[in-house]
């Protein structure tokens, strides 16, 4: 989903800002759909090299956008005087914010496993998600309030940030795209029990491109709400498994007996995701709590059933 949205976004940005014919939009989606996966195709070193260039460039764009918006609205007094045309409930707003980063956060270990130490991994994650992602959310919300326009492409056009914005936005989207498809490949290889990472990467790019061609760009808000509902329960299962079942200490990978799938985890996840999706309250929190509680209950039920089976077999002897 994210890959499809990013692919469609950069194609639409180029067509609008460079005044290209509308007929170029779909071919550009195909071009970027497969082009964005090149660094992920190379591997982690490709991701790292691109990020070293793109992150500073995106920081410059964010600062420029904030400064321009502040100037256009007339400073802090002008900003406080703006009355939004539409409103969201607090629960929906929180769900949308969760949706912007929860997918990447849940799969962050795909990158942090390359860190020099666990301390570096933790701090890098905290800085990246809270400061980096937080700054991007603030910038997007700031522009939406000032210009009464939720579309980031239209905001950049209104600010007059044309060519520089195209280059910086392109780099930023590329870092999002290659990390997204890298995660897809890692999960896909694990699911399919294959080491053909590059083939899975291309397959993911193909699916993402099809979704982009199908109109994913228009579905960003519903997609964020969906992500904010169905992804957080995964974290609930992981936390319950780590802190409750394994008491905060997983066995070494070489010594662990890994099942083909965790039936308890899957059942708890489905229950948590369903409750989050249909909940009238803050969906991500509901999903995490329900999934974690369900996993603990199912685990204890399984352990009790196994204990009774052992006792029955012992008595039979």
Indicate residue ranges for each PLM-predicted region.
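Hydrophobic transmembrane alpha-helices that form the core helical bundles
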Residues: 1-20, 174-190
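Membrane-water interface regions at transmembrane-helix termini and the short interhelical loops
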Residues: 9-20, 32-54, 110-116, 186, ...
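Hydrophobic alpha-helical segments and their helix-loop junctions in multi-pass secondary transporters
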Residues: 12-15, 24, 40, 56-82, ...
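Transmembrane alpha-helical segments of multi-pass small-molecule transport proteins
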Residues: 17-42, 56-65, 89-105, 130-137, ...
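Hydrophobic, membrane-embedded alpha-helices of multi-pass small-molecule transporters
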Residues: 68-72, 81-143, 157-178, 259-273
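TM-loop-TM module centered on a large, flexible mid-protein loop between adjacent transmembrane helices
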Residues: 131, 135-177, 181, 188-194, ...
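C-terminal membrane-solvent junction of multi-pass transporters and transport-like membrane proteins
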Residues: 235-317
